[in-house]
Amino acid sequence: MTTPSTSTAPKTLYQKVWDAHVVATPEGEAPIIYVDRHLVHEVTSPQAFSGLKVAGRKLRAPEKTFATMDHNTSTRSASLDALSPMARTQVETLAQNCKDFGVRLYDIHHPNQGIVHVMGPELGITLPGTVIVCGDSHTATHGAFGALAFGIGTSEVEHVLATQTLRQLKAKTMKIEVRGQVTDGVTAKDIVLAIIGKIGMDGGTGYVVEFCGEAIEALSMEGRMTVCNMAIEMGAKAGMVAPDQTTFDYLEGREFAPKGEDWAEAVAAWKALKTDVGAEFDASVVLDAADIAPQLTWGTNPGQVVAIDAPVPNPADEANPTIRASMEKALDYIGLTAGTPMTDVAINKVFIGSCTNSRIEDLRSAAKQAKGRKVASGVTAIVVPGSGQVKAQAEAEGLDKIFIEAGFEWRLPGCSMCLAMNDDRLEAGDRCASTSNRNFEGRQGRGSRTHLVSPAMAAAAAIAGHFVDIRKPY
């Protein structure tokens, strides 16, 4: 068995967090790493808890496991009667498992209940330098705090519950630097969509990505979470941003963040969580923030994306036959014609929410577009806050009234229309401006057509009835 590296060579942020968590490296096997926080929800945990019961095992560290109900909960009612039979079984099973194993649960009646990747950070469960896992592919969200966070499968969920460790191969490192500052109307969602458009859906495969540069540093924690949330959409194992004063200001005073003298000690340690001068990455990508316009997807994966002032791409212009065929297939499904201005594309549904864009900053941005206006005739638009805390804050600021007066539906927290796993889903043929993270075929409902955009772009589309360039009057 080998021991963790004690090299004094310059290290990347990822390498520092990784090295601090390697428990053992058995010869010829994947390293074993320690897990600081384990987040669970109702969909990927039942089999894991069942496996523990069959084996007669207890949780290794129940105090480091946090559960919520989010994926298939209703955003119309907090009553169990509002759930489908399968959804009700899943939430009731999670409640019983948490009771049996001593796990802290934020159920549908708890004021802090919400989407796992919204709730965790706002409670201070997510901290810099920690390893965080969850049975959900968008766990990379927490990397915005300088944590190493990634999704795991159900069998791995069971393993972490039982041992608080995980076998994991070390990833390669990639630096994605966004230089300069974005212009007005360009958000974190536009930045990450532009990145995916540049490197493709598989450009980050095998890597842990560190996002850096002036444009990233200028983002709020909400914005950084949006960027890291979609690291998986470029194929990356995880995404990370080095913690700084913005991070510390966000975390201070939150329920599970260190307090008193422990806080000062923690911040001192967190300040060392940055890539050393001279550290080498396996790959690097650079974007100029000034070149990024508001983005939206035109096809059936997040990499099929263009600027709002561009037309629908023409597959005939693509030299690679495989990519060309993929573009043709996407256009056929999405029902668009090459050369059509994206501002001419009409929508009939709008979804503002998801673990990508349901935080208070996102809702403020959308409300700014909606204030004093009305949702277009024939358009149904819903706003789903990411957690009970976000909902309460938005209502305290009067954002709910702005949305309701404009004709939007104001809902309860949950994953909602991000995925067709609950009652919020699209019908075949619907075209939706969505602030979620995936636009795959059928993602929001069988035959549904999804265009990924920022909250501001989604709200503007709801008002206009079609996509608009929010940098211009409409």
UniProtKB/Swiss-Prot annotation:
It comes from the Bacteria. Keywords: 4Fe-4S, Amino-acid biosynthesis, Branched-chain amino acid biosynthesis, Iron, Iron-sulfur, Leucine biosynthesis, Lyase, Metal-binding. [4Fe-4S] cluster binds at C355, C415, C418. One of its GO terms (biological process) is L-leucine biosynthetic process. Transmembrane segments: none annotated. Its cofactor is [4Fe-4S] cluster. It catalyses: (2R,3S)-3-isopropylmalate = (2S)-2-isopropylmalate. Pathway: Amino-acid biosynthesis; L-leucine biosynthesis; L-leucine from 3-methyl-2-oxobutanoate: step 2/4. Its EC number is 4.2.1.33. GO terms for molecular function: 3-isopropylmalate dehydratase activity; 4 iron, 4 sulfur cluster binding; metal ion binding. It is an enzyme of class 4 (lyase). It holds the Pfam family Aconitase. Binds 1 [4Fe-4S] cluster per subunit. Catalyzes the isomerization between 2-isopropylmalate and 3-isopropylmalate, via the formation of 2-isopropylmaleate. HAMAP family: LeuC_type1. Belongs to the aconitase/IPM isomerase family. LeuC type 1 subfamily. Heterodimer of LeuC and LeuD. This is 3-isopropylmalate dehydratase large subunit.
